[in-house]
Amino acid sequence: MNRLKKHYEEIIRLDMIRKFNYVNPHMVPKIDKIIVNMGVKEAASDKKQILAPLLILELITGQKAIVTKAKKSISNFKIRKGFPIGVSVTLRGNNMYEFLSKLITLVLPKIRDFKGVPFTSINKYGHLAIGIKDLLVFPEIESEYDKFNRVYGANIVIVTTAKTKKEAGVLLSGFQIPLNKR
């Protein structure tokens, strides 16, 4: 069993039951999935530009990434329906906990001038959105730095089953995600 999953089952879950007085054990919030997404605007003009972000996401998540395509044409952005515009990975189960552990212990502390994730990054549905401007902070990418011609960023969304912002904040704080109450 993963370290974070065990921590959730043995400590966080019990703390949340005490704090929020849930009557049913299935009401206790948990992390449902983690979505890692990269938008690649250059891919609209040159389809080969999608390969590097695809490889990066597969390296950092350990799971096959999918290419996201434009749902409709937008002439101002020179995008046609069906053009590749990004890559995405949805993590669940053990892969999710492994990625979260890596994010908390290795990646977030390496980000320069990182003062924590703002509490306002949690939306009303209890989902936390984190933007990382430079993926070179991931250990898998550091050693492969010379293979990529530019710096890539990504959006990471941690989807929880929490009903309120407060529940989500307590849950994510239990996982040692540094939240700032700004």
Curated annotation (Swiss-Prot):
Keywords: Mitochondrion, Ribonucleoprotein, Ribosomal protein. Its main location: mitochondrion. The keyword Thylakoid does not apply. One of its GO terms (biological process) is translation. One of its GO terms (molecular function) is structural constituent of ribosome. The keyword Ribosomal protein applies. GO terms for cellular component: mitochondrion; ribonucleoprotein complex; ribosome. It comes from the Eukaryota. It holds the Pfam family Ribosomal_L5_C. It is found in: Mitochondrion. Belongs to the universal ribosomal protein uL5 family. This is Large ribosomal subunit protein uL5m. It comes from Reclinomonas americana. The lineage of its organism: Eukaryota, Discoba, Jakobida, Histionina, Histionidae.
